Amino acid sequence: MLKTFLAAAALVAGLSGIAHGHGDEHETVYGKPGDPKKPARVVQIVMREQDGKMIFIPDRLRVRKGEQIRFQLRNNGAVDHEFVVGTVEENLKHMKEMEKNPDMEHDDPNAKRLKPKATGELIWQFTKAGTFDFSCLIPGHRPAGMFGTIVVE
């Protein structure tokens, strides 16, 4: 009986620790996942191939520190594309990982992969000032021009 009680107490303590830390687990230097219940500025991002390049339209954004953005993503291209928010350094590092595993799909709050002609949404709150990156990290796409800049002021 004592063993059962101690095991249950350990389980409850562990779960309460998980619940306690949940709110900040995705905080990054470029922000955190947005709250879909809160207002957000809508920014439409189109992904496509054009004249031998792969591009985002627009490829430069200005955001206020603390602002929440609802990215409405549309892949108008003929191949899969993704939208990954991060620092340039993080995205370049992850791009190298993607070269080793090109079929890697993301299930992260800062990334969304879309099939051709598909749409999707990503909500992100930019909590710190700085210059950040968004990229398509599918092998060959970023070097073909598929990246952009987010300036948070």
Briefly describe each language-model feature range.
Residues 1-6:
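Bacterial N-terminal signal peptides that target proteins for export
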Residues 36-68:
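N-terminal edge beta-strand
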Residues 15-28:
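Cleaved targeting-peptide boundary
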Residues 89-100:
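Short aromatic-acidic-glycine turn motif
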Residues 7-16:
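Bacterial N-terminal signal peptides
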Residues 53, 99-108:
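Short beta-strand and strand-turn-strand segments in soluble, beta-rich domains
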Residues 58-84, 120-128, 152:
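Beta-strand cores of secreted/periplasmic/IMS beta-sandwich domains, seen most often
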Residues 22, 108-153:
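Extracellular/periplasmic metallocenter environments
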